[in-house]
Amino acid sequence: MTQTLSQLENSGAFIERHIGPDAAQQQEMLNAVGAQSLNALTGQIVPKDIQLATPPQVGAPATEYAALAELKAIASRNKRFTSYIGMGYTAVQLPPVILRNMLENPGWYTAYTPYQPEVSQGRLEALLNFQQVTLDLTGLDMASASLLDEATAAAEAMAMAKRVSKLKNANRFFVASDVHPQTLDVVRTRAETFGFEVIVDDAQKVLDHQDVFGVLLQQVGTTGEIHDYTALISELKSRKIVVSVAADIMALVLLTAPGKQGADIVFGSAQRFGVPMGYGGPHAAFFAAKDEYKRSMPGRIIGVSKDAAGNTALRMAMQTREQHIRREKANSNICTSQVLLANIASLYAVYHGPVGLKRIANRIHRLTDILAAGLQQKGLKLRHAHYFDTLCVEVVDKAGVLARAEAAEINLRSDILNAVGITLDETTTRENVMQLFSVLLGDNHGLDIDTLDKDVAHDSRSIQAAMLRDDEILTHPVFNRYHSETEMMRYMHSLERKDLALNQAMIPLGSCTMKLNAAAEMIPITWPEFAELHPFCPPEQAEGYQQMIAQLADWLVKLTGYDAVCMQPNSGAQGEYAGLLAIRHYHESRNEGHRDICLIPASAHGTNPASAHMAGMQVVVVACDKNGNIDLTDLRAKAEQAGDNLSCIMVTYPSTHGVYEETIREVCEVVHQFGGQVYLDGANMNAQVGITSPGFIGADVSHLNLHKTFCIPHGGGGPGMGPIGVKAHLAPFVPGHSVVQIEGMLTRQGAVSAAPFGSASILPISWMYIRMMGAEGLKKASQVAILNANYIASRLQDAFPVLYTGRDGRVAHECILDIRPLKEETGISELDIAKRLIDYGFHAPTMSFPVAGTLMVEPTESESKVELDRFIDAMLAIRAEIDQVKAGVWPLEDNPLVNAPHIQSELVAEWAHPYSREVAVFPAGVADKYWPTVKRLDDVYGDRNLFCSCVPISEYQ
């Protein structure tokens, strides 16, 4: 035996699990691209002056089992008290059928945002159901497919109110004083950059204030009071003031829809429809508005359209509102939202149906009535007579009550003067209520649940008669069928089968980094120690979270070359916004608040200019040269022209053209010379980790897409995480939080997300990835990602020219295939190729970004040579098909490309095409067939005939 014990223990075993090509395959690919080793290849490609001499020291790799045991020990430091804190977060009962078949199912969580609707019909249907739930509960006409959280939805409502307001000279936004404090925090942050004045006052005093363009009310106030705002809304509408209402999704099951009371915009958190609290997220927000405002709405909207055969099909509608098209003129910078969480909430509603939801809501309310009756019998006073699930109880000995609660491992809301808040939820039992009686009244209270139940059942006045819902909800068949677990399991599987996710094939989307989301990384997110914590619980109950977050932040600091990391932003777009705010506040601290010009290369991702606009900056575009690199001459000219008004540059590295620009350090130096800061977009961090770093390059701040580089799955369009890394001088200006302050982890700045650490419950995924890969594995992952991209580029460049390359004709971790010459020559477009790839079993690469008429391919390090070769063979076969069109064998108007994708029903229909059925659906090399369920979508029909709610069930049959 020649191996040592250390070798046999194989602590780096996960590295080989994560990286697709084995050593032999890597060598074959290196030979194909003309490089001797991974180090030699990256040494050729990455500019010498930015190569790290040694990898960042983030530790040795650990096995899956060792890492899980280590993280379990950390998680066990969290204390699982029963939390009645409320404030927009409650405990839930996630149905096991949804837990197992969606949250723990890679067929759902590894899919991408449904830009390619033909391979996304399942989750699009689930999202359409989510929109229908939103429409029914809010009483409005148009709903989005989720926003990031309730507080950011409030900020979006404010921005939308200004867009649609007819009071163009008004610049004040009124917020009722009993909205959740974290909502107000995020609204204030957003208002500052937009130049809005925020007024906070009692809702009934809103008419005392002048020049108000919009109002934010909360139907059930933060301390529990149900408000009937019907008359107030009517008066506000008569004055042309846009009214937004924050609502509780479970309360809406019983309460009057705000839309029926005249509200223009209604939003809230869908968390309590089955999504664990998770120390703050991720959670989906719902958002609805009147039909007349639909083109001003933020976020994704799913619409019903037709496919090429005239069959009903779903798609993302009205995308011209969004950042990837409208850039700085977009309604919002939102890119990824919260699709996976919206779909959990959607299926929660499907599984329970209207009867089940009413039973849950009524049970919560009944237990709240029982608690209220018992407390009042014993002489305690409630601050509000009307409530749904939350009581504000006035107490004399508040310290004693809180001490007894702590001894009983109970969290009450403690920030209310001379009172405590108690919010019940669907997990609350009669035993819990008895325990609350003991905490508030002492053990000898003498109260009986059944006696109290009889009293309140016949005389409950806690919901005003005018506020009781009098219309039916969720009448569509989809909410009234799938109530047995067998039916639900089959329905979810039928949706999953319609979609193409990473569990079936490579998803070669450029700028998206669709890498492995390993099972070991996913396991901890459903551990109760992580899933069940309230984000506003006392910090000493979340020591496990704090340790995990601090350790992850330390690793990210080392990997990025920055000095500090803030975990709050809950998407990449939010990270951009937070980073730009840090720059803005830094300049203001130096009495240079006039610096408001943001330079952005022409090739930038659409979120960059949209985020800059949100941060109150002016966007100035910097040209790219013929090689796709930043034009240094133009950069210097624009920087000099901006002068003392230069705030920053937003640059992506490697560039969005898939190249390591040789002059990146010079770019940083030019901007610094004129007093600006360098924002390095972390979208392409997968080509930096272990090789170089933003801080080493010379940047001041970056966001990190943990859902790209660090293995959080895309979830079909969310969740994401976008923490920001900053140099020391920017660290005091990262987001803070008004409710929670943890020394060394949060600043006193305004918040950008509802929870202090954003979507904290998915951070264990990135922790596990880094822990299992170690410094050695992380560097190798970057190197193999570069190898895979260069292998594809070298194999395809004769058939599809690679548009941009760096030194020696190399690319970074992705490559752009130029389809424009072929289109000009043959009429076949990048869209045709993208749709034909579906017939070969692949999701399309990124289309027409960053250059129109191109396909951008990013294979990631997780794809094996076998899968890469399968993709290459498919692309070469498609090129041969294009040649058939060029040669006149198939006419341009009738060939396998323009008719793609092909569906099963076509095989049994009359066949009049000049190519065979076999060529259509079993092209060369296709063995394990993926079947799309719809043909190519008719986008024009969808936008001209906008329909964004559930269609009759017969349409799906």
Swiss-Prot record:
GO cellular component terms, semicolon-separated: cytosol; glycine cleavage complex
For this protein, the Enzyme Commission number is 1.4.4.2
The reaction(s) catalysed by this protein are: N(6)-[(R)-lipoyl]-L-lysyl-[glycine-cleavage complex H protein] + glycine + H(+) = N(6)-[(R)-S(8)-aminomethyldihydrolipoyl]-L-lysyl-[glycine-cleavage complex H protein] + CO2
Q: Which GO terms describe its biological process?
A: glycine decarboxylation via glycine cleavage system
N6-(pyridoxal phosphate)lysine modification sites are K708
Q: Which CDD domains match?
A: GDC-P
The alphabetical list of record keywords is: Oxidoreductase, Pyridoxal phosphate
Could you say which enzyme class this protein belongs to?
oxidoreductase
Give the InterPro entries listed for this entry.
GcvP, GDC-P_C, GDC-P_N, GDC_P, PyrdxlP-dep_Trfase, PyrdxlP-dep_Trfase_major, PyrdxlP-dep_Trfase_small
- Cofactor(s) it depends on: pyridoxal 5'-phosphate
Keyword Oxidoreductase carried by entry: yes
Similarity comment text for this entry: Belongs to the GcvP family.
Question: Subunit structure, briefly?
Answer: The glycine cleavage system is composed of four proteins: P, T, L and H.
What is the protein name stated in its UniProt record?
Glycine dehydrogenase (decarboxylating)
Gene encoding it? gcvP
